[in-house]
Design a protein with these regions (language model features):
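Alpha-helical subdomain
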Residues: 1-112
Length: 112
């Protein structure tokens, strides 16, 4: 949905998708994130502008609240909505994250 820029809200699209799933289903979502910090929001705005002028034509960075709204009605699995880079299976991070890693988040949710 991070490349979707249509008339229907992404929250409505996800609501319809989630409603069609049986109870007990899991939904995984990753999305471009505007982290709402001075340093990283500026990077998100520059990347969004780059996407607009690329063959993709779109790339929308949404806030944490907007992304969480796409998962409404789901029980988020720990750690909830977090930076994708924080889903590390190999132990603690050794090097600092590159700035772009602060601009994509993901979550997994279970439909009750």
């Amino acid at each position: 949905l991070h490349h979707y820029d249509g008339a229907i809200s992404p929250q409505e699209i996800m609501r319809e998708y989630i409603d069609a799933l049986p109870s007990g289903s899991y939904v995984a979502l990753s999305h471009f994130l505007d982290p709402q910090t001075e340093e990283h929001s500026e990077l998100a705005r520059r990347m969004e502008e780059t996407f607009l002028h690329s063959p993709m034509g779109t790339g929308r960075f949404r806030t944490r609240d907007e992304i969480e709204g796409m998962m409404a009605g789901l029980e988020l699995v720990d750690p909830g909505l977090t930076l994708c880079a924080d889903w590390w299976p190999d132990g603690p991070r050794i090097k600092p994250l590159p700035p772009v890693s602060y601009c994509i988040a993901g979550a997994v949710g279970r439909k009750p």
